[in-house]
Amino acid sequence: MATRKVRYKKLSVKTQLAVLREDQIEASEYESLTSENQIATGVEQAEENEYHLQAVLKGAGVAADQEIPVPPPQQSELDYDQFYPQKVAKTSTYIRFSQTVEECISCLYDMTEDDETFLKSYNMKLTPSARLSEDDFERIMDVYEDMAANITPFSAIDQTVPSYQEMLRGLEPLDSTKVMVHAKQIYEYWKSRREISKNRPLNPTLKFETHAESDELDPYVCFRRREIRQTRKTRARDVQSADKLKRLRKELEEGRQLILAAHNRELLKADMLKVERAIFDQRAIIKEQKLRLGIRTGDEDLVNQKPQKRKAPEAPSAQRPPPPPQIRMPVRPDGRPAESDLVQLSDRLAEKNAELIIEIEKKIQNHIDWNKNYVDLTGKPLSPVQGPRQDLGFRPAKTQYLMTPPASASSGSMDEPTPMDLDKPKPNPPPPVKFRGVAQDEQSLAHPPSYRRRIGRLNRLWIDRRGLPSPARDLSEEQSDRWKYDQSSDDEDDAPVYMLDPFDTKALRYRASIPLQTVTRPPPPVINRQFIPPGAVPQQLAQSSFAPGQPQPQSQPQPNQSQSLPLPQPQQPVAQPQPQPQPQAQPVS
């Protein structure tokens, strides 16, 4: 399986890293991570795979493998539980003091072989009681190193060595009786050591990078500088930078030319002032000479500029009317424009609305052009953009009414022409008859009805209609009568009164739909003809045919056809006719 390299980013203190223990990672998962992902080391592929080392090993394959002696591991028999307590109490604060490790330990300076040789030769000259010990020597050398690092931190560059008087301030904390006697001689030795090491610290320190070329091959240089690859600049960025530089050069050149032109202008002004002053001085001399010699001539030489002659105004041929006075709007004291110059909110909204409409129309046209010559056959096609579309086969129907043509001349009599009606004006002429078409509203004009004729199956002719309003749907009887029986429960004693329309045809339709077989009628009365008197009226017989207690049908008044019917008023209840007892017909004896 091919491995892929993963370039990991630099670690940062702001990035949270997951810490996993050994038991949290399975062996198979660890092997897959180590085999699939290879961390990019930043070196060449040949050096990374060590081809040269593999070639050397293959060449020396016949050589016998030499075993390297390694001491065998031995188990430690130390029992740390006996020396350390089991329960460890954590302190409230881990920081006990702010001193560094170097400040806590003893002197940081360690004697070298040269120091030991110098100290032996120095002590040979002194008595045994006045000799300098190795610890005091290290303490003095350490003070000199610390003071030099504080006073001259860049002594390795400028080769500056602090004086002996500056070093005495660091020797004050030490024992003056033992140290100050040897301070001068130790300072001279320390100064010679610094000069030999090119004024570098005598204590062993880490070697940092000072010069990139000389320190490149030095293996002891620590903390090398990280080489950051510069970002590759594309051609577009180069062109943009070049344009900016050209524009800047042009602007600077224009500014330079303006400054030069202004400088030349000021020089010309200075020359002109000098010439005018010289002319003034010469005229003053001429004036004095004229006064001294008594010359009385014109003073044209003393005048710098002659006044120009003005043309005489021409007489107007015709008196022109004065122009109308201009009406000026009063200026406001605060300097703001007048209300007529201010932009109205309605105008601003109208402009925004017009811009929005133009943008929408442009997008609609772009959408139409984009879908041109394409048919959307997907499961859920896009809805067509609202706009003018062609209705194939549909033609709008335009209603036109033809006026009645005038009577033909041939239909009249062929006799002599009769005088016109204008010759004999009528006293009360009839009002002119005005013809009005079908009322059309704006909606019908915007969407006129259209029709299409097509032939279907079995050569049947179909007429398709568009734009006609659908008829209003009547509510069902249950929905229409639902509100009629919604009575409040406050007045339970009163009988419910239902609102009925006396002119509604639903009741008549319901009664007309009842079959005759289901209606129970009383049997017709039996009339004994022998008891009928000879002069009985048919109306009396009709009245006697009803049983006692049965109501007589009341004749409903029929409205006159010439009169207009009253409008239905559903708010007024209609009282139901109550049955009235009729006298029973008695047989005639």
UniProtKB/Swiss-Prot annotation:
Biased composition (Basic and acidic residues): 474-487
Predominant location: nucleus
Protein location: Nucleus
Region Disordered, residue ranges: 298-339, 403-430, 468-497, 516-589
Cellular component, GO, one term: piccolo histone acetyltransferase complex
Described purpose of this protein according to its UniProt entry: Component of the NuA4 histone acetyltransferase complex which is involved in transcriptional activation of selected genes principally by acetylation of nucleosomal histone H4 and H2A. The NuA4 complex is also involved in DNA repair. Involved in gene silencing by neighboring heterochromatin, blockage of the silencing spreading along the chromosome, and required for cell cycle progression through G2/M.
Keyword annotations of the record: Cell cycle, DNA damage, DNA repair, Nucleus, Transcription, Transcription regulation
Signal peptide positions (record): none
UniProt biased composition (Low complexity): 557-566
InterPro entries assigned to the protein according to its UniProt record, in alphabetical order: Enhancer_polycomb, Enhancer_polycomb-like_N
Record's protein name: Enhancer of polycomb-like protein 1
Quaternary state and interactors: Component of the NuA4 histone acetyltransferase complex.
GO biological process, one term: regulation of transcription by RNA polymerase II
Family: Belongs to the enhancer of polycomb family.
Feature: compositional bias, Pro residues: 567-589
